[in-house]
Amino acid sequence: MPAAIDKDENIQKEGKRIELVKDSPKQFAASGAAAVSAQPNSDKLADVSPLHAERTVAQAQEASVSSFNEEEVIHDLQHYLPSQAPLKDFIHHNTLHAFQNYPFHEGTRRAKKIFGYFPSLQLREYRDLYEAGRIRKDILERVISEQKGAQHLEDWMQRLLEKEYDDSVSPRIGKLRANWKRHYPIDLDLMVHPLLFRILCSYLDQGISIWGFPIGHKGFLAALKEMEEKSFASFFKTKRAKKLLVSGNCKMADLLKLLVGDETLYAQYLFDQQFAHPGWSGMVASVEAQPASLLNPKNITVHDLVVFELLLEIDALDSYFGESWEPIAHILEERPEPLFADVPETEVDTVFSLWHDAFEWTYYDQVLTGIALQDKTWERKIENRSFQTYFCIDDRLTSFRRYLEQLDPDCETFTTAGFFNVELYYQPENGKFYTKCCPAPVFPKFLVKEIGNKQKIKKEVHFSKLTHSLFQGWFISQTIGFVSALRLALNVFKPGSMPAGASSYTHVDKNATLTIENKDPNDKENGLQIGFTIDEMVQRVQGVLTSTGLNGVDKTFAPIVYMIGHGASSVNNPHYTAYDCGACGGRPGSVNARTFCYMANHPKVREALKERGIIIPPTTQFLPGLHDTTRDEVAFFDEEILSEENAGKHRRNTLVINEALDLHAKERSRRLVSIDTKMSPKEIHEEIRRRSVSLFEPRPELNHATNAVSIIGRRSITENLFLDRRASTSTYDYRTDPEGKFLTMSMGPIALVMGGIDLEYFFSRTDNHKMGAGTKLPHNVMGLIGVANGADGDLRTGLPSQMIEIHDPVRLLVIIEHYPDVALKVIKSQTANYSFYENYWVHCLALHPDTGELWLYKDGSFSKIYKPLLNDLETVSDLSALMERAKKAESIETLDAVQENLPVYFIEKKERVKK
């Protein structure tokens, strides 16, 4: 996930860019036909008055002054291109981050009209949802009345429900460059892209190819130039393009003069060109911005990519027409509309925004009704805590917490960002590279190294490089190859683990030690401090414990406090890092959990914490664990540190945890068509495990599909609500943090991590063709950096359809339990993330701790009290029965998928008896 956009910087840059593109049409219009030919036509000037001719010549001369700013255009391209990192660092982010400096509906409208994205459901789908009751009439009427006035309610209801609209998209992007095909009988993309993509893939390859790219240590363009000079074969079919590259006379402006001919069209042409393959262009931009994202470093820039593609286009045209073809400006019949000209709101845009707001608030209203009707004074009282667990804020873990509390009423659960406030780089033993284990925008100063890894790396003979050689490859295919085919067939009926699988448990060896403590600040490696000093440990442990209200005074410690990170296992899944912990940079949370527990168990850290008002009893021990969310299994680390008494308690706690995992697997199974939810929890859990290692299962788990809400507050707010695993929760106790100091820490990952997750699912769901990756079935892994359809396709960005089919595209609703003025101060202090709230890319409410009022963020402040329209929610007493009778989606049509999501329920409060 990229760092959040700096609003002021982007507005300034946007302003410069808009000024450029708005000036260009003026120059074009002023010079008339001269702008097309780039030279004033004196014969035509003779037909006009002397005054007009003088003015026209002056304007033509003004237009001849260069209006093309190469650096500015490249910068703009980098801003608007997809910012998806290579597969090993795939982390969710706002797909339309480039428009985040606009209010949500305006930004999505611009993205739709400029780039052809479809950022909402179809009009037919909204109307179907309304007919099915999934968009409530009272909510729709409230939305219309608030935005258009109550006096216009009937008129707008008629428009939304009955009027026919043309909701097709005719984007501005590509219209200039489309004139090649319109004027000449050629498909320039078809002639250029296959070769371009293969060269890019070969150059950026991270380990698939047996032969590395020749001269790969040089920059992209420099390497191509040297290869062209020293090779018998050529990248080009004609002499001119080759000569331009080899001679070094390939300045971008000169090449554009040959291809375009009019400087005022250069920028638009480059946008058309690069957005014909946004996947590869975006990958190049991402690698240029973060070279360390490639383990096999490559020096490539968007500038070099553009120059080489321009050369290939010149070569393609020369091969077809010789050198007699005209620049595109000379063959224009009609000048295209400037790409970034203003995008006025039309009636159909308003209709879409009203429908979508009503769709969102129909769900939000249920959640807020549940919160508003809660007993504000109720909080579960626990006299003798059996154990306490910390989980990540991840929405997939909310039901796991619920089952733990149901099975053991004396346990207590907390949530915090899954990196547990310890930002670090991690280096496995014998590893060449550092792995960042913290949110993507954070750049740690600390390095934790693994020592004593005794894991044996599984090997597979079919992965041998010999399989690619002529004779050995033939021999292996004719012998071991048959065994491989049999194993593949067997996997259909009896899935099992294999070396090709990705398992979160291999992230760190269970028996290895970590260099967590730093006793000498000068102990550094590559500028990174190895381990943490005592003071640094104290700060991080205090932050987590204080923000969650666990300080040993107001709330006492249990004998064992589990810090459980999360990861995932999968087979044949290129997007595997998207299933791991986003707060850990797309890595499992095991290293962070072990690091935090070491800190919290350190005697000197506890002494310092005691001076700060946090009293941890000597009998309390912190124990790290890792939850595999695909298999629903938990593994523990460092169990040998437990005292004899706590070891016995840990064994009893493990029984509770395993039973909770069985129940959790049953709840998950209601969305998995291949599993009968009426089976016993243990039988279902076994089926879940088999799915996780099946080569033929495109949906081993549904990851964050259906996520919609993020709640920052005490557990009592949500403990008696059934939210269908759609809410991420961050434990925060305002009573221990009246000024909001630690709320800032809790809010840090909300917009960036959870908001990014929500928005990527949102846009991959509404337009899976352009903003998503399409179906997984034709995907090929390209160079270990991305996936493409077939061998010569563009890289696919966003999420595959199998991850988003059941997702409701709604913005994240953030609910903060604190006084509105404190909540406002905190979100405004986070300048890097504030645009999420300011421009409504996420919704935000403050839950007043004293009155229970829900204050909605609007126009820069929490100035409006939201009053839910529902008076009550249905109460459910048996969740297992609810899961068994819940409807499974019959198709991936929006109406079917949405109806699979259960409404919000109250969970009947029962007298809990510990088993």
Curated annotation (Swiss-Prot):
Which residues are recorded as binding Zn(2+)?
C392, D394, H566, C581
User: Which cofactor does the UniProt annotation name?
Assistant: Zn(2+)
Name the keywords, alphabetized.
Cell inner membrane, Cell membrane, Membrane, Metal-binding, Transport, Zinc
Q: List the molecular function annotations (GO) for this entry.
A: zinc ion binding
What Gene Ontology cellular-component terms does the record carry?
plasma membrane
User: Which InterPro entries does the record associate with it?
Assistant: DabA
The protein's topology relative to the membrane is: Peripheral membrane protein
- Where does this one sit in the cell? Cell inner membrane
User: Domain of life, per the record?
Assistant: Bacteria
- Report the function annotation for this chain: Part of an energy-coupled inorganic carbon pump.
Quaternary structure and partners: Forms a complex with DabB.
Q: Which PANTHER family match?
A: INORGANIC CARBON TRANSPORTER SUBUNIT DABA-RELATED, UPF0753 PROTEIN AQ_863
Protein family: Belongs to the inorganic carbon transporter (TC 9.A.2) DabA family.
Q: What is this protein called?
A: Probable inorganic carbon transporter subunit DabA
**Species annotation:** Nitrosospira multiformis (strain ATCC 25196 / NCIMB 11849 / C 71)
The taxonomy runs: Bacteria, Pseudomonadati, Pseudomonadota, Betaproteobacteria, Nitrosomonadales
Q: Which gene encodes it?
A: dabA
